[in-house]
Amino acid sequence: VGAPLAETPENADVLLLPGGGDVHPRFYGRAIGGAVDIDEARDERELALVDEFLREGKSVVGICRGLQLINVLFGGTLHRHILGHAQVCGRDRLHVVHTAPGLLHALYGARFTVNSAHHQAVEALGEGLQVLACAPDGTVEAIAHKSLPVFAVQWHPERLCGAFARSDAVDGAKLLSALLRQSKKSKEFLKKC
């Protein structure tokens, strides 16, 4: 995130937007109420990076906050505070998601369990985005752009693999491997998610 904008797309195949604090509500036309741990400078840098990568035709992948930021970039809005999805006593919650046909369905099936550690979520979906997975309460859990190489999940696959793997949730390594392997091979891959 701290690399010069002009150099970043040239030196990378994929931009990964990780989790973190809340997206500042000013970026989607709202007042601060309910948002916490805001870093406006980070928001501005990451929004600019996404724009740079997309202009170069490169892939953008978001995790948690990354999904929220992508939604905002395309004109969507966020619920500033939802209940039932944040960590409890420092531990991720678990819940089921339901998927539409596509990458997630191919990897994990129509219904599977993921972790949850967020309190912001998609409210209005950004232009050109489509929902790929939802929680039972309707919370958007995965999105992709209809024509650009953009894909994002609300959960943390990096906290569901390796030493952090859980027997009661999906293997996050399957998703991360598929995204990174395929996005390096083809700019068209993420358009098909």
Enumerate the language-model features and the residues they cover:
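N-terminal beta1-alpha1 cap of cysteine-dependent amidohydrolase-like domains
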Residues: 1-63, 72-73, 79, 83-108, ...
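Hydrophobic, aromatic-enriched interface-forming segments
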Residues: 67-69
